[in-house]
Amino acid sequence: MKLVLIIAMAVVVFGISVSLISVQGQQNNVIPQWIKNNAGWWADDSIDDESFVNGIKYLIDSGIMEINIDTTIQDQGDFYLTYKPNPNSPYVEEDSAIAFLKNSNLLEQEINFLNENFRLPYDVEVLAQECGNANAWYDYEIKQIVICYELIDMDYENYIYFHNEDLDYAYETVDPYIYDNLDWTFFHEVGHALIDVYQLPITGLEENVADQFASLMLSYTYDENTGDYSIGQDMLYNVGTWFWISNELYSVNPDDYPFWDTHNLDIQRFYNISCYAYGSDPQYNQDLIDEGYLPEDRAYWCEEEYLVMERAWSFLLKDFDNGFFD
């Protein structure tokens, strides 16, 4: 334990992020004699703190002690996907939630993206299943993201109902609407997973932080052929629409609503996501202000709000990504 504390102290002094220290010529974790001597002299006050630290610094600078700073976490796990049957779907098989998921290839694509860009210390399952209610969550005990088929069904039904006066438009646009909101929901739960797996030191409500991560990920979505980022902006527009519709269909009764809940009200999440979209690209999203969806008083700070959010997540994940935020 004394040895670990000594090495840790030296590392902190030099400001080096260390995941692995290897000494030339030493194998199988054998502690070399020079470390024992140096540590012993320091522990016995035969040398002062400065001499001890300078000795470690010399070994690092001269290459005798090799420091691997390429990774601070080993990539020992992956996100992986499991589909469970969807026998109780209210729709025919080809229109079921599981069929939508599999045909869209959404989860497969995003899981590949995550595994390419982030290092996990262990596996995290993404489970698509029937839950008995419309929901999605991250299970901290078993390290599992759950996407419920009922959530997809509910999104479909609410969207069609909300646009019942123009069903042609509703049926034409419902699939991308569901896709975008499912994508955002998935990344929201991934945000929870990353906070847990990496033990990220967040401040504020975790639900809000997960909302920010999901919105940030969608804002990065672009057309690989043209480099057009408007795709991500349109996806955020659909997510905002999702919360707007939910607010309209499920009005809040102050006497019944659980204001103690960790989630913001749907209308608050609508304004937050609209702000993130505007902040990431004010010119493209000027219509949010022009059409009265985003008040100018909030929009004034949205660019800074987005940059703070981006810097925060970049800093939090700098030791765990493969250069995604570089």
Enumerate the predicted regions with their spans:
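Pan-zinc metallopeptidase signature
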Residues: 75, 81, 253-326
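Post-HExxH zinc-binding segment in Zn-dependent metallohydrolases
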Residues: 205-249
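Short pre-active-site segment immediately N-terminal to the catalytic Zn-binding motif
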Residues: 160, 165-185, 198-202
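A metal-dependent hydrolase signature that marks the N-terminal structural subdomain at the beginning
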Residues: 70-161, 168-171, 301-304, 310-326
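Acidic, Ser/Pro/Thr-rich low-complexity regulatory regions
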Residues: 3-8, 15-75
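Active-site recognition of the HExxH zinc-binding catalytic motif
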Residues: 147, 184-197, 207, 211, ...
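Active-site-proximal beta-strand/loop segments in catalytic clefts of secreted hydrolases
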Residues: 129-131, 148-151, 187, 196-198, ...
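Sec-exported extracytoplasmic/periplasmic mature domains
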Residues: 40-47, 57-65, 115-119, 191-199, ...
